[in-house]
Amino acid sequence: MLRFLPDLAFSFLLILALGQAVQFQEYVFLQFLGLDKAPSPQKFQPVPYILKKIFQDREAAATTGVSRDLCYVKELGVRGNVLRFLPDQGFFLYPKKISQASSCLQKLLYFNLSAIKEREQLTLAQLGLDLGPNSYYNLGPELELALFLVQEPHVWGQTTPKPGKMFVLRSVPWPQGAVHFNLLDVAKDWNDNPRKNFGLFLEILVKEDRDSGVNFQPEDTCARLRCSLHASLLVVTLNPDQCHPSRKRRAAIPVPKLSCKNLCHRHQLFINFRDLGWHKWIIAPKGFMANYCHGECPFSLTISLNSSNYAFMQALMHAVDPEIPQAVCIPTKLSPISMLYQDNNDNVILRHYEDMVVDECGCG
């Protein structure tokens, strides 16, 4: 009678319902989160603004009771229930000579996509290049950004990796702030064929503007760019197992508001992540009100209700034959939560989880 709950989610809530929150086996919860083991982040990663905003918007909607499709990222216009912010694991390359006519900055960009599970479908991959804060009062030269796919693994001591065909070329004023590029097709190819992921080759040139009358020093511009440049990859995926169409739950008998404590009703249960030692990798929330259902479902609760209801029929059969189990106290309404956390690759992840909070209970 509990088949409408995902197995792992139900196992998690059942253990909590039995009052064993501190002792329960950690792997059940970690597996439900899509993790093989408890993350041990090497360093604290700041939460990107876009992830923080999406999380806060969802929290506000849940507080006010506004219904939202949490498997659709409105802010980005794509379907998905897992948002990952992957830091660049590449490094700078140093050309032998810097001039206005040559490359100002070269960098190998590398993003580890191994955290994406097999069932997840990529719906967005957005490369972000932060070129430093915007400045309208201290404009610099125009920059030309070129991106190449790296064809072979970089060999230590090699001056530059072997770039393939250029697939992005864009001119931007500097300082510009953040510049974004759509890498969905590239990321899909990397995800399907991990051995092809040798990274990206980024080249930035300083364009000479003879008409501006301003004499820029390329060396100064390049040095400032090396200090300010930060690259990241925002990846959104959709897990079809967790983002299915809304299901009609099997009807359960609502429990009347009676004073008897033994009857089926919702019990409050707050899960504090600090108490469990998970605050080191779960950024937000600090905990959540999971709740659970517990209590008896005697025949007297069902006799006056619709006789076609399955719970009423089971209660009736139990009255005839005690060998048949009674109707049980189950969740009739559950709500999701969103979580911000870090994984073992120092990725910041925003993930939506269905059926984590028990809102109402009934006999079913």
From Swiss-Prot:
GO process terms (BP): endoderm development; eye development; formation of anatomical boundary; in utero embryonic development; mesoderm development; negative regulation of BMP signaling pathway; negative regulation of epidermal cell differentiation; negative regulation of myoblast differentiation
PROSITE patterns: TGF_BETA_1, TGF_BETA_2
CDD domains associated with the record: TGF_beta_GDF1_3_like
Positions glycosylated per UniProt: 112, 306
Record disease entry: Klippel-Feil syndrome 3, autosomal dominant: A skeletal disorder characterized by congenital fusion of cervical vertebrae. It is due to a failure in the normal segmentation of vertebrae during the early weeks of fetal development. The clinical triad consists of short neck, low posterior hairline, and limited neck movement. Microphthalmia/Coloboma 6: A disorder of eye formation, ranging from small size of a single eye to complete bilateral absence of ocular tissues. Ocular abnormalities like opacities of the cornea and lens, scaring of the retina and choroid, and other abnormalities may also be present. Ocular colobomas are a set of malformations resulting from abnormal morphogenesis of the optic cup and stalk, and the fusion of the fetal fissure (optic fissure).
Subunit structure: Homodimer or heterodimer (Potential). But, in contrast to other members of this family, cannot be disulfide-linked.
Protein name: Growth/differentiation factor 3
Gene for this chain: GDF3
